[in-house]
Amino acid sequence: KKTKTMKKLLTVLLVCFGLMTYGQTTINPDTVCANATGEQYFVTNTPTSTYNWTVTGGGGTLQTGQGSNSITVDWGAVSGLYPNAVEVIESNAANCPGTPILLDVFVLDLSGNLIGPFCAGDPTTPLVGNPAGGTWTGTGVVANAFQPSTAGVGNYILTYSMAGCNTTINVVVNNGPVTGPIQHY
């Protein structure tokens, strides 16, 4: 009876170790934009394996792909670093689980300072983005500052970008009055 039990145990061990699952690697942490939708995460596919995904923190919601090697996630609006926000455990054909693979996710929520309205001759105003370190672009933007005289009269959309994320602000430059010369009666 002991021999039969040992044979069964040995068979299970051989099947599990013979169909080993292997850990995957990725860049950690991952950076996503606040309110991003359809963000795809995947591991190398082993055709006979199944995959159990868990998404926690960052307002993340697993949308599609549970059980497969690829999922899509919609992220929330609250910025911050979320340790172990995405986890996957691969199980082989013998239903033996592999090592959990964990991914930290940094949700990046950009904002820009509201400025203006301006008059056509107003001085240059620095543009401030949060978090710092991004780049401002748009009509009238020079070296992360807005120059009303360069932009001219009009309505403008300025964009702040960092790590693939963007936010915009609207800026208005108004025409100043045109006053005629001083005259004497």
Where are these regions (language model features)?
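Proline- and Ser/Thr-rich low-complexity, intrinsically disordered segments
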Residues: 23-49, 54-185
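Bacterial Sec-dependent N-terminal signal peptides
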Residues: 1-26
